């Protein structure tokens, strides 16, 4: 397919050429958005991100975060660069590069083509994707080894994603921006059909439908949500008892500040278990981070917990 026609599959009736306005939904979607913002804050001025958080509970994300930056000979979306840098921060890549498989081939040899094209960032890129999509990782097999370059192209096109009244509705965010996978594009087929590769806890399957999605066996996912979902685990705070928690609310602004405060409290050693957190007042937490709840003070705020691998 010609490149121009391919882009038309993604571009709909764009309300704004510069921003994507997102509204809170179910907690998994909300955690995906907050996790995405958390990763962006690693590479951007946090104040810029906080300006995106609106009083009506929405978040207005500037589309230029999906535009490409040059890494060696390859152009890579800035949002993906942030994720790669976040996932590899402080790691001794040399140790990983020297590791060998059963045939004696080192990781450095296996990923040489990425170093040739991207320089040192090529090593980080492969390592980061392995941390997301390899065996026993959060999104196992969602993006496979031969999909890595296609994955870059896919994220790049999020800068032109739009909403079209004709397209089908995304069953994660509710927007009319579902893109039908190309018949010969195995990556799109995996990304745009929500199943256990997106979330081992919540993804439905043809064999075991999930009640979280009204027992549907297949769910349509828009390109944006497919990318956001691979960030949801980064919104969770892990406690000493190995449980993980996320504070959910009908406002991205409230969620951003409350979960930030939760991380700060945990790092200072003031809470170690979910039980201790439940003893704290959500309003008290909000006041401590100077979040003026205003009309939101009666909102339905909930604490989502994950223990022993289950929510």
Model region roles, listed by residue range:
Residues 16, 32, 41, 58-60, ...:
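Generic serine detector
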Residues 36, 42, 66, 86, ...:
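Phenylalanine-focused residue identity feature
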Residues 165-181, 220-235:
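Extended amphipathic secondary-structure runs
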Residues 195-311:
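Domain-exit/linker segments immediately C-terminal to small folded modules
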């Amino acid at each position: 397919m010609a490149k121009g026609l391919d882009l038309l599959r993604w571009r709909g009736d764009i309300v704004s050429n510069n921003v994507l306005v997102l509204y809170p939904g179910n907690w998994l979607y909300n955690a995906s958005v907050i996790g995405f913002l958390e990763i962006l804050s690693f590479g951007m001025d946090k104040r810029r991100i906080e300006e995106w958080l609106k009083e009506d509970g929405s978040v207005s994300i500037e589309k230029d975060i999906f535009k490409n930056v040059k890494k060696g000979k390859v152009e890579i979306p800035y949002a993906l660069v942030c994720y790669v840098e976040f996932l590899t921060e402080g790691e001794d890549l040399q140790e990983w590069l020297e590791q060998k498989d059963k045939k004696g081939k080192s990781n450095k040899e296996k990923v040489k083509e990425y170093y040739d094209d991207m320089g040192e960032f090529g090593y980080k890129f492969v390592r980061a994707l392995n941390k997301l999509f390899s065996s026993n990782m959060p999104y196992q097999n969602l993006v496979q080894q031969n999909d890595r370059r296609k994955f870059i192209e896919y994220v790049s096109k999020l800068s032109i994603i739009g909403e079209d009244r004709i397209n089908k509705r995304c069953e994660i965010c509710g927007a009319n921006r579902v893109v039908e996978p190309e018949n010969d594009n195995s990556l799109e087929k995996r990304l745009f059909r929500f199943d256990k590769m997106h979330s081992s806890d919540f993804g439905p399957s043809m064999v075991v439908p999930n009640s979280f999605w009204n027992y549907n066996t297949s769910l349509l996912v828009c390109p944006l949500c497919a990318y956001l979902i691979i960030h949801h685990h980064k919104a969770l705070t892990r406690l000493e008892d190995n449980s993980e928690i996320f504070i959910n609310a009908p406002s991205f602004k409230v969620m951003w500040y409350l979960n930030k405060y939760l991380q700060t409290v945990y790092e200072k050693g003031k809470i170690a278990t979910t039980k201790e957190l439940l003893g704290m007042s959500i309003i008290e937490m909000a006041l401590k981070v100077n979040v003026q709840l205003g009309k939101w003070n009666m909102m339905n705020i909930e604490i989502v917990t994950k223990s022993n691998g289950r929510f």
